[in-house]
Amino acid sequence: MATNLRGVMAALLTPFDQQQALDKASLRRLVQFNIQQGIDGLYVGGSTGEAFVQSLSEREQVLEIVAEEAKGKIKLIAHVGCVSTAESQQLASSAKRYGFDAVSAVTPFYYPFSFEEHCDHYRAIIDSADGLPMVVYNIPALSGVKLTLDQINTLVTLPGVGALKQTSGDLYQMEQIRREHPDLVLYNGYDEIFASGLLAGADGGIGSTYNIMGWRYQGIVKALKEGDIQTAQKLQTECNKVIDLLIKTGVFRGLKTVLHYMDVVSVPLCRKPFGPVDEKYLPELKVLAQQLMQERG
């Protein structure tokens, strides 16, 4: 059902203007930039997209714009997760209407829901997605929901689930999931362990830093397919040097600043309460943008 979803998927950023409104022109440029750099697909409206500081209407606008720019060109996964099941269902219906290839949802958070309530939440979204496969999104560090291996096994075998985004540093668990579910589409979620995640059984990845250097991650995939571990390690190291800087700056605002210097995003701001990048990092980010543009050619 979801085998066509394998690959390298950029977790799309959401550009805003100086007034904190959605910057539609920059969003369109960013989608095209990702297509041009050879990304297999886009994961829209997730953590990287600052979904949880947007209104439902804004999230729907983002889905619509991305579909207009990319439908039929690359694979599109709509993250529709909300704490509210009804709002998640509304976004899932919109994703179906706009022509997305799949939906995804983080486990509902903040309140201490039971595991059966989590399952019911996913069943309801799957029903509203009307045939689109579900990508379960496991990110315990941000959601606060720490699923056991048995619970993950239950979620990924719910009717309608076709994939799992595993944003966890537990590579042993990644391998266990692959061993238990050989046909499940399995995404690595932490960019800094992308190569290791592939070796542990992931089919590809969904990541934020793919927005600025997606070709490097495609290079890792190619190298590992060819058995060239040395090249894969070298590329992962180069990616991680960038990630080291972004962790210092704040990942999302750092990425937007790099894309600003690449003339893709007009305003390098995240939505409040996120603040701007500390000015002391701007020279390094500008040099990084220049280096990546030169490398990409």
Swiss-Prot record:
Binding sites annotated in the UniProt record for aceneuramate: 47-48, 167, 189, 191-192, 208
Annotated CDD domains: NAL
Record-linked Pfam families: DHDPS
Biological or metabolic pathway of the protein: Amino-sugar metabolism; N-acetylneuraminate degradation; D-fructose 6-phosphate from N-acetylneuraminate: step 1/5
Catalytic activity: aceneuramate = aldehydo-N-acetyl-D-mannosamine + pyruvate
Described purpose of this protein according to its UniProt entry: Catalyzes the reversible aldol cleavage of N-acetylneuraminic acid (sialic acid; Neu5Ac) to form pyruvate and N-acetylmannosamine (ManNAc) via a Schiff base intermediate.
Similarity-based family: Belongs to the DapA family. NanA subfamily.
Database matches in NCBIfam families: nanA (TIGR00683), PRK04147.1 (NF003164)
Name by which UniProt lists this protein: N-acetylneuraminate lyase
Lineage: Bacteria, Pseudomonadati, Pseudomonadota, Gammaproteobacteria, Enterobacterales
Gene: nanA
